[in-house]
């Protein structure tokens, strides 16, 4: 079906990175939810994410779905600037090469993108997965940005799923702490996307089978919080 042919996947890799760093007895320090990344860590992060990327592509191949790897060692499309000095090699996407992406999509293949980028000196940087996905969605003006997580979207005070929410309602929920720290980076990625040409952005439970298909084909979605823009909104501060 056509629905598969225009998808772009940006993957993460936190648990695999943690396993590999543990093996080398490297303790990670986090600032604002981002891993402080020195030279030793960035080398491990890059190799783990590239291996994971190749695993995803080969499992899709086995399902007769043609996918193409994109990462810092092959067709890098993300140019970054350093996010903050104290974070080391953590990058903020500055520019996305749409041509490579659109070329892959035109061949009816799915781009599988690692959350890595290169700065102007070709130094590899680690990128927060949600930030990378949002930057790509904005750049190609996607119809939909879906951020997959292991929880059911955004929950209200009664812990019930909110299926549609506007940007102004989000700000209220952050003020009264209904939306907590862990969800804020995802919400920010969604807000940034819908402020910049993406029709709607959602946070979805990726551990539920077929959750993406439900979201694309059904009116009700499946454990999804969909964020529509009500007016331009500044990012939330943590």
List each model region and its residues:
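Alpha-helix C-terminal capping segments
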Residues: 2, 23, 135-143, 192-197
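Structural motif
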Residues: 8, 110-114, 146-148
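Short, ordered loop/turn segments at secondary-structure junctions
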Residues: 12-15, 22, 33-35, 72-75, ...
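Ligand-binding beta-strand-loop-alpha-helix segment within the catalytic cores
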Residues: 22-112
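Polyanion-binding loop/helix "lid" in catalytic or ligand-binding cores
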Residues: 38-65, 114-120, 124-136, 162-212
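Glycine-rich phosphate/pyrophosphate-binding loops
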Residues: 68-71, 77-78, 140-154, 203-204
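Conserved, well-ordered active-site substructure
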Residues: 162-165, 214-226
């Amino acid at each position: 079906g056509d629905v598969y042919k225009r998808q772009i996947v940006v993957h993460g890799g936190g648990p695999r990175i943690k396993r590999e760093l543990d093996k080398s007895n490297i303790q990670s320090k986090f600032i604002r939810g981002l891993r402080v990344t020195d030279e030793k860590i960035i080398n491990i992060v890059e190799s783990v994410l590239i291996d994971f990327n190749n695993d995803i592509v080969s499992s899709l191949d086995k399902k007769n779905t043609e996918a193409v790897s994109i990462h810092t060692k092959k067709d890098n499309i993300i140019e970054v600037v350093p996010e903050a000095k104290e974070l080391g090699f953590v990058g903020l996407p500055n520019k996305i090469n749409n041509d490579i992406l659109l070329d892959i999509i035109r061949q009816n293949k799915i781009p599988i993108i690692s959350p890595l980028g290169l700065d102007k000196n070709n130094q590899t940087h680690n990128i927060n997965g949600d930030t990378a996905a949002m930057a790509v969605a904005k750049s190609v003006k996607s119809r939909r940005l879906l951020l997959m997580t292991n929880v059911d979207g955004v929950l209200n005070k009664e812990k019930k799923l909110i299926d549609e929410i506007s940007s102004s309602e989000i700000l209220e929920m952050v003020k009264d702490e209904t939306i907590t720290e862990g969800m804020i980076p995802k919400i920010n990625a969604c807000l940034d996307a819908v402020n910049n040409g993406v029709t709607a952005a959602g946070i979805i439970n990726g551990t539920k089978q077929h959750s993406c298909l439900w979201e694309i084909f059904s009116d009700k979605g499946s454990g999804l919080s969909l964020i529509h823009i009500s007016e331009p909104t500044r990012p939330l501060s943590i």
